[in-house]
Amino acid sequence: MPTKIEARLKRKNRIRKKLSGTTERPRLTVYKSLKHIYAQVVDDTTGKTLAFASSLSKDLKGQDEGDKKADAKRVGALIAQKCKAANVEAVVFDRNGFPYHGRIAAVADAAREAGLKF
């Protein structure tokens, strides 16, 4: 019986077979650890990271530290802001094998509210 991590990696690989970011619509991938959340926008055709944000970012350090879900919302808004600065309007959302719930959904919703198209 696979462990939780092995099952997530299996889901991740199954999703990544079908999901790929292009220059027009790069891939917004999200990773969460027990304490922090990370988001990056990747152009898979060139293999370059176009934008990156995490709950450890210096841009978010001065803000009031709340719960993890509030941190995820701030990361979603920050990644959308950095995408606009990099002239990225639309992305493909890669949940990285995590269930679309809680902090993962909070990042996606905040990015949508900030004007990023999925």
Swiss-Prot record:
CDD domains the record matches: Ribosomal_L18_L5e
Gene Ontology terms, MF aspect: 5S rRNA binding; structural constituent of ribosome
Cellular component per GO, a single term: cytosolic large ribosomal subunit
Coiled coil: none
SUPFAM superfamilies: Translational machinery components (SSF53137)
InterPro entries cross-referenced by the UniProt entry: Ribosomal_uL18_bac-type, Ribosomal_uL18_bac/euk
Keyword annotations of the record: Ribonucleoprotein, Ribosomal protein, RNA-binding, rRNA-binding
Gene Ontology process terms (BP): translation
UniProt function note: This is one of the proteins that bind and probably mediate the attachment of the 5S RNA into the large ribosomal subunit, where it forms part of the central protuberance.
Assembly: Part of the 50S ribosomal subunit; part of the 5S rRNA/L5/L18/L25 subcomplex. Contacts the 5S and 23S rRNAs.
NCBIfam families in the cross-refs: L18_bact
Protein name in UniProt: Large ribosomal subunit protein uL18
Organism listed in the record: Myxococcus xanthus (strain DK1622)
Gene behind this protein: rplR
